[in-house]
Protein backbone atom coordinates (compact mmCIF):
# COMPACT_ATOMS: atom_id res chain seq x y z
CA UNK A 1 0.00 0.00 0.00
CA UNK A 2 1.41 3.37 -1.02
CA UNK A 3 1.53 6.15 1.57
CA UNK A 4 1.00 9.79 0.55
CA UNK A 5 1.57 13.04 2.45
CA UNK A 6 -1.13 15.69 2.73
CA UNK A 7 -1.53 18.82 4.83
CA UNK A 8 -4.69 19.65 6.78
CA UNK A 9 -5.09 23.34 7.64
CA UNK A 10 -7.52 25.31 9.82
CA UNK A 11 -6.83 28.98 10.53
CA UNK A 12 -8.30 31.19 13.22
CA UNK A 13 -7.55 34.93 13.51
CA UNK A 14 -4.72 34.39 16.02
CA UNK A 15 -3.67 30.76 15.54
CA UNK A 16 -3.23 28.31 12.68
CA UNK A 17 -3.50 24.55 12.89
CA UNK A 18 -1.30 22.88 10.28
CA UNK A 19 -1.08 19.09 10.41
CA UNK A 20 1.03 16.92 8.11
CA UNK A 21 -0.66 13.55 7.61
CA UNK A 22 0.74 10.32 6.16
CA UNK A 23 -2.21 8.37 4.78
CA UNK A 24 -2.91 5.55 2.33
CA UNK A 25 -3.36 6.32 -1.36
CA UNK A 26 -7.06 6.33 -2.23
CA UNK A 27 -8.14 7.89 1.07
CA UNK A 28 -10.78 10.60 1.20
CA UNK A 29 -10.75 14.15 2.54
CA UNK A 30 -12.75 12.97 5.56
CA UNK A 31 -10.17 10.24 6.29
CA UNK A 32 -7.34 12.80 6.25
CA UNK A 33 -9.17 15.21 8.57
CA UNK A 34 -9.91 12.40 11.02
CA UNK A 35 -6.28 11.23 10.85
CA UNK A 36 -5.04 14.78 11.54
CA UNK A 37 -6.83 14.78 14.91
CA UNK A 38 -7.89 18.38 14.23
CA UNK A 39 -11.44 17.72 15.41
CA UNK A 40 -10.09 17.08 18.91
CA UNK A 41 -7.82 20.16 18.98
CA UNK A 42 -10.56 22.74 18.56
CA UNK A 43 -14.32 22.79 19.05
CA UNK A 44 -14.82 25.11 16.06
CA UNK A 45 -14.40 22.37 13.45
CA UNK A 46 -17.37 20.26 12.37
CA UNK A 47 -18.11 18.30 9.22
CA UNK A 48 -21.65 19.72 9.28
CA UNK A 49 -20.86 23.42 9.75
CA UNK A 50 -17.55 24.02 7.95
CA UNK A 51 -16.87 23.92 4.23
CA UNK A 52 -13.84 21.92 3.11
CA UNK A 53 -11.58 22.61 0.15
CA UNK A 54 -8.33 21.68 -1.54
CA UNK A 55 -6.25 24.66 -2.67
CA UNK A 56 -9.22 27.05 -2.35
CA UNK A 57 -11.63 24.85 -4.35
CA UNK A 58 -14.55 23.43 -2.38
CA UNK A 59 -14.70 19.63 -2.38
CA UNK A 60 -16.95 16.97 -0.88
CA UNK A 61 -15.82 14.85 2.07
CA UNK A 62 -15.73 11.76 -0.18
CA UNK A 63 -13.26 13.38 -2.61
CA UNK A 64 -10.15 11.20 -3.15
CA UNK A 65 -6.96 13.00 -2.15
CA UNK A 66 -3.61 12.98 -3.95
CA UNK A 67 -0.05 13.27 -2.71
CA UNK A 68 0.79 16.85 -1.69
CA UNK A 69 -2.81 18.09 -1.38
CA UNK A 70 -3.52 20.92 1.06
CA UNK A 71 -6.90 20.28 2.69
CA UNK A 72 -8.37 23.52 4.01
CA UNK A 73 -11.18 23.76 6.54
CA UNK A 74 -12.96 27.09 6.10
CA UNK A 75 -14.42 29.12 8.95
CA UNK A 76 -17.97 30.41 8.81
CA UNK A 77 -18.45 34.12 8.22
CA UNK A 78 -18.88 36.12 11.41
CA UNK A 79 -20.33 39.17 9.66
CA UNK A 80 -22.28 39.64 6.46
CA UNK A 81 -19.94 40.99 3.72
CA UNK A 82 -22.40 43.78 2.85
CA UNK A 83 -22.55 44.86 6.49
CA UNK A 84 -18.74 44.81 6.71
CA UNK A 85 -18.44 47.09 3.64
CA UNK A 86 -21.03 49.48 5.07
CA UNK A 87 -19.07 49.70 8.33
CA UNK A 88 -15.79 50.28 6.49
CA UNK A 89 -17.26 53.05 4.34
CA UNK A 90 -18.73 54.70 7.44
CA UNK A 91 -15.35 54.54 9.24
CA UNK A 92 -13.40 55.84 6.24
CA UNK A 93 -15.77 58.82 5.86
CA UNK A 94 -15.42 59.52 9.58
CA UNK A 95 -11.61 59.46 9.33
CA UNK A 96 -11.60 61.82 6.33
CA UNK A 97 -13.54 64.40 8.36
CA UNK A 98 -10.88 64.32 11.07
CA UNK A 99 -8.04 65.10 8.65
UniProtKB/Swiss-Prot annotation:
Database matches in Pfam families: Ub-RnfH (PF03658)
Gene3D superfamilies: RnfH-like (3.10.20.280)
Family of the protein in this entry: Belongs to the UPF0125 (RnfH) family.
NCBIfam families listed in its UniProt record: PRK01777.1
Listed name of the protein: Protein RnfH
Organism of derivation: Buchnera aphidicola subsp. Acyrthosiphon pisum (strain 5A)
Organismal lineage: Bacteria, Pseudomonadati, Pseudomonadota, Gammaproteobacteria, Enterobacterales
Gene: rnfH
